Every structure is written in C-alpha cells, then in structure tokens.
Amino acid sequence: KIFERCELARTLKNLGLAGYKGVSLANWVCLAKWESNYNTRATNYNPGSKSTDYGIFQINSRYWCNDGKTPRAVNACHISCSALLQDDITQAVACAKRVVSDPNGIRAWVAWRAHCENRDVSQYVRNCGV
C-alpha cells in the first residue's frame, strides 16, 4: 500500500506515534517519506551486512525482524520481516516504537538524519487536520 501523506499522518497518530519518545508526528511522516516514499511494500538489500530493510520505515533484518536469511539476526521486535510489509502498519509501528526506544532514538534512521534532522518538518503534516 502506498499511503497518501495525510492518510499516513492520521494513521500514525491513531497508532500512538505522535510525540512517542519525544518524536513529533511530523518527524515520523518525514522519516517514512524518505525511507520508503510512504510504501509499505518497500524492501532494500544491504550487501555489506547481507541484511534487508523492510516496509514503510525500512526496518532492518539484522537487528529488528526475522527474514530467515540474515546472518546473526537479533530479531529484537520478535516479528517476521514480512509482517512489516502488510497494508496494515500496526506491527510496523510497534516495531518502530521498539527501535526508537533504544539510546539512538530516531537517529537510528539514516534517512531521518539526512533529510529531517534540524529541518522544518511541519510541511509533512500541513493541512492534515492532525
């Protein structure tokens, strides 16, 4: 599923991400824009670590989910990576909450550091009624 910007903002708010661990809703929408272009089915393989990033938040199989093929995988979210590709993003959001609970917080995501950090992210929720 490819979310429309405001549809995603409303969904993330309903799933409790607004202000979670101090991260604003606009920052989460910015993250999703630059990681997956709002696409729940997005996958990207990382040859160096032989790991894959999954879903709207591009959550990595080395640490967070199990895809059955990543060496030394940790599976800290206790989830199948395929669950992160569903149209229903409830499980992806739950895992993102686990990721952002680590000391690195939202900085765990390279795309957030590159495109959202220290920027005006208000545009990502503008006119969304959230």
Swiss-Prot record:
<feature type="disulfide bond">
    <location>
        <begin position="30"/>
        <end position="116"/>
    </location>
</feature>
<feature type="active site">
    <location>
        <position position="53"/>
    </location>
</feature>
<dbReference type="InterPro" id="IPR019799">
    <property type="entry name" value="Glyco_hydro_22_CS"/>
</dbReference>
<dbReference type="InterPro" id="IPR000974">
    <property type="entry name" value="Glyco_hydro_22_lys"/>
</dbReference>
<keyword id="KW-0081">Bacteriolytic enzyme</keyword>
<protein>
    <recommendedName>
        <fullName>Lysozyme C, spleen isozyme</fullName>
        <ecNumber>3.2.1.17</ecNumber>
    </recommendedName>
</protein>
<comment type="function">
    <text>Lysozymes have primarily a bacteriolytic function; those in tissues and body fluids are associated with the monocyte-macrophage system and enhance the activity of immunoagents.</text>
</comment>
<dbReference type="InterPro" id="IPR001916">
    <property type="entry name" value="Glyco_hydro_22"/>
</dbReference>
<feature type="disulfide bond">
    <location>
        <begin position="77"/>
        <end position="95"/>
    </location>
</feature>
<dbReference type="GO" id="GO:0003796">
    <property type="term" value="F:lysozyme activity"/>
</dbReference>
<feature type="disulfide bond">
    <location>
        <begin position="6"/>
        <end position="128"/>
    </location>
</feature>
<dbReference type="InterPro" id="IPR023346">
    <property type="entry name" value="Lysozyme-like_dom_sf"/>
</dbReference>
<dbReference type="GO" id="GO:0050830">
    <property type="term" value="P:defense response to Gram-positive bacterium"/>
</dbReference>
<keyword id="KW-0326">Glycosidase</keyword>
<feature type="domain" description="C-type lysozyme">
    <location>
        <begin position="1"/>
        <end position="130"/>
    </location>
</feature>
<comment type="subunit">
    <text>Monomer.</text>
</comment>
<comment type="similarity">
    <text>Belongs to the glycosyl hydrolase 22 family.</text>
</comment>
<keyword id="KW-0378">Hydrolase</keyword>
<keyword id="KW-0929">Antimicrobial</keyword>
<dbReference type="Pfam" id="PF00062">
    <property type="entry name" value="Lys"/>
</dbReference>
<dbReference type="GO" id="GO:0031640">
    <property type="term" value="P:killing of cells of another organism"/>
</dbReference>
<keyword id="KW-1015">Disulfide bond</keyword>
<feature type="disulfide bond">
    <location>
        <begin position="65"/>
        <end position="81"/>
    </location>
</feature>
<dbReference type="GO" id="GO:0050829">
    <property type="term" value="P:defense response to Gram-negative bacterium"/>
</dbReference>
<feature type="active site">
    <location>
        <position position="35"/>
    </location>
</feature>
